[in-house]
Structures are given as structure tokens and as C-alpha cells.
């Protein structure tokens, strides 16, 4: 009987711990990039566009996108906070896609792009929710590291550059998109880094996510 009571107490304890851990996942930042390999990442159409140098992902080459395909949330995020350290070089364009899916070729059609661009000819600057809520101001310089932060909670997207909020967008309930952009909406999905073109060279490191309750 004593052993049975001990077993019951332990069972309740472990289930409680498991439940607490699930509820508290939003309290922990989880790294998506180990700094050494492309484990859990999958590149599209031109994989050679992405390289690893000194613990950084370097995007430089023909159009390609690097999708997170790892075990965290089974690479299917709905509500979350994401942050990454980013550095652009002069004339470079890139982006971070959210709520997207792996796509073999072309610009990802699902989800939203958060712009990385401090000096390239496209007027939509770093922090823009591309084509939806665009930023004209330049908040950071080329050749300097900055933090790009993205939060999705419900129908709201918050984007910060070095702790400064540059976008606070709420998706309308009666959302309508053109036929060529029907999947540009909040749902759930993974993240992707963009390799825009051979003239663009952008660095990423310290890519962290904090899942939030659905």
C-alpha cells in the first residue's frame, strides 16, 4: 500500500511538471541555429547562396530561401516572439518570412515577409511588413549588428528594430487579398531567411524563438 501511494504521488508530480512545462514554454528563448551547421534548416532552389562563417549564416548569391524545418514546435509556429541579430552590407536586400512553408522555387507565397534592407534601391526599409505596412525610415546602418524582433499574437504583428517599435499591425477580420497574394495572411507555419540576389550580402546569427500560447 505504501509503495502504491508513493507511485501515485510520483505520477501526479511528473504530470504536474509536464503540464507546467507546456504552459511555460513562452518563458524560454530557444535557439534555432547552432552556429555550426544547417541542421534543421532546408534551402530552396540555390542552396549555395547560404554559407556558415564564424557562427553566422551568410546570405549571398542567387535567389534562395532557408527554411527552418526542425523539431521546435514541429516547425509550425502560430503565436511567438522571434529575434535575430542581423547585419547588412551596402546595397543589400533580404528578409525574414513568418507563417510560411517550404517552397522549392520562387518568393515564398505563404505568410508575411519582414524586410531587411537599409540601403538597397527598394524603398521599403528594414522592419517593413513587406507590402502591407511599410517603413520608409532607416533606423540602422549597414555594417552594424542590430536586433530584428517579431511578435505574432492572435491577429497582431509587432516588429521592433533595436527595441524600437516600427510596425504594430492588426490583421482585419474581413481581410481581402489580391488573387496573387491570397496566402499573405496569418495562420501558422515556419520561418525562412531570404537570399535576395548576388549583389546582396546579409549576415544572421543568434536566431531565437519564444513560443507563446495559442
Name each model-derived stretch:
Residues 17-214:
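Carbohydrate-interacting regions of secretory-pathway proteins
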Residues 1-25:
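Bacterial Sec-dependent N-terminal signal peptides
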